[in-house]
């Protein structure tokens, strides 16, 4: 019989200052503190004045059981000097300890009455400054109420969460639209911290041009390695280890810049530009981070420090209660900057924020997944073994494609060169969403239907976990649509493949649908198995027609932004829909049992019931690549995922993407205050995390969320106009991907176009450029092998359409410039800013040459360099190599350019 595990003590500690006054402190040369504990624990006791923790020597004491102890915290020489001056002295005691497995802190402050003997008889009392502040707004950055952001000032203690905190947003303090409607949403306050990929926002007085930015030598997206330069003026500190964290910074260039999306100037001027600071890889769950800006200058002159921050930094007491309450919170901030070796007097501003816990970020969709698969009878999702039943499947239609009459031209309607059959139907999926109501959708019929467009997660009363039961009683389901296609036995051969095929889950792009799965039948080497896809609800075409049009109305100031919650909520339901589709493909009683998927009485595809991952893979493009990263972290039935043109951190991708150009003018018109707009976009990430990889990136490869381990191939299109390269690289860093090298041909990273600043990037000098910092590179020869990746679980390959090629009308037909290093999307030739070339987003994922690298990996044959020459993958001009299945690859003609441009 196994020995019982010892109970973990959950002792609670309190502290009390016993020293009566200043005279007693100076006489004893120590601060007397009483420490009480309700059980066994170890306590580190320290004291500070005005956030200065170097005035007293800390002590650590141990409790073996419940009791109280008195400790003396000796004054240091600087403490005797500072606290020996005339005047009452306010001190704060902090006790740090373990409560169970969680870190806990007890704090207590006291003002020690002054020693009159230290004050001259005629010395007038010192009048304390009393700066003006706004209730519930952080006084250290008064430009806007919720600056700086993210910020633990906007949290409250909550012992029920893993971080010990809960967000405490208030409607009256949050950004508002043109009609004065707050973007407040109660969903924010379900979080126990901020996003691992939050855009960090603050305002630096006078810093509003690229010249003033470069004057300070800030780390930027093109030279991330500068984050740990000894003199770096913007730093992010992980307080767990006092180490700097990789970041990059920029100015919000939207205010005062000609609007590339139409409509002239965006509201605001250069003076409204905030500083935006971005993590270069996902931050760690549940950790506390300190942001610090120091030694800032504009035009060679020091930037003025906000008076409240200066009072806190320099230990100057005020008569303002809100400032003094903030002082207690700032003590840990200054302790972190002290430990990081940053002189306190150099600070322009500093603050702290806590990242949400893994449990908080993942438990909603995890509870949905566990419940959904429990209903099928599979209670162990980590073993790759099928247990229980297949989902309920309905086949609605089948269609046999015609062959193409000419192999060198595009197919006509109802024809496909590579696909033989299309099958459409639905899968019954547990629905964990409510009925949207008319305020969330333009579809009257869908307003009363759970899981319809505009619906949000359905929470049981008093619970933070979604439930399938409407009104607490009736479980509801959703018929998730799917499209599957089965390949031919060869190009234009009028016969269906008969047996032994692999299975592929396909993830479509933004505002598309399950029908996009058919496109796999258009490209050479793309359809190498039975492929099935469902809708990425939340950002599918059904949402565009209903919920997203309603969202546009909201942005147009008819309501507040609480409707946004539906987008990431619906995406999480979409993960469950996709996992059920995968189980329908993997299970022998699923699709394989239907005649439409059989030939001669035998299924045309074969998935091992004891190791599903070797026969089933995931392939997603664009939104499918983004959502595919998150779903792979949750996926029990596939091992390998190919993520084409993916990224993470939607709040950073948003304004950089041409896909959102149709929405942004409406956003700009509804939210006219540039600073509030920047804060609002950053806030969205707190909700959006669960609807993209930010919440799940730490577990994509390692099976940390109760799945088998996974392998991932990331495909980046250099200069992508829809998914900025910087966010694809952020995903690669976050999961530890190795890049296939050489990454780019010489000169490509310097091909900047009209946004070049005297030959440099806007925020970075060309001789400092290193965009792929901290992504290991392995040369091509290390990859050409079967059986998996070369010692890695993740690889990133960068493909390039090459320099811009212009057509007879002068418009670009192929090739692109590098991404500009600002937060505005590349634009087309008829916009107010000259074009940046032809968007490589679609060709980058669908070129025959690229398919030759994506598909063999997906099917378990490892990662291969289809170009075969060890050179960077510039594939813009023909000839393209033929698929690897050919014993002697030879060049083949490219599809007609209009074929790709029209999205076929």
Would you name each region that the model predicts?
Residues 269-294, 298-299, 470, 475-521:
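A conserved hydrophobic secondary-structure block that centers on an alpha-helix together
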Residues 60-69, 265-270, 472-476:
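Short proline/glycine- and polar residue-rich coil/turn motifs
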Residues 597-655:
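Primarily recognizes the serine-hydrolase "nucleophile elbow" in alpha/beta-hydrolase
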Residues 386-496, 503:
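Domain-level recognition of soluble alpha/beta enzyme cores
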Residues 502, 562, 566, 570-573, ...:
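C-terminal subdomain of alpha/beta-hydrolase-fold enzymes, centered on the catalytic histidine
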Residues 1-142, 148, 160-163:
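Polybasic, low-complexity, intrinsically disordered segments
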Residues 121-410, 415-439:
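Acidic, low-complexity Ser/Thr/Gly/Pro-rich repeat segments typical of extracellular/periplasmic
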Residues 437-438, 442-479, 495-600:
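Cap/lid segment of the alpha/beta-hydrolase catalytic domain
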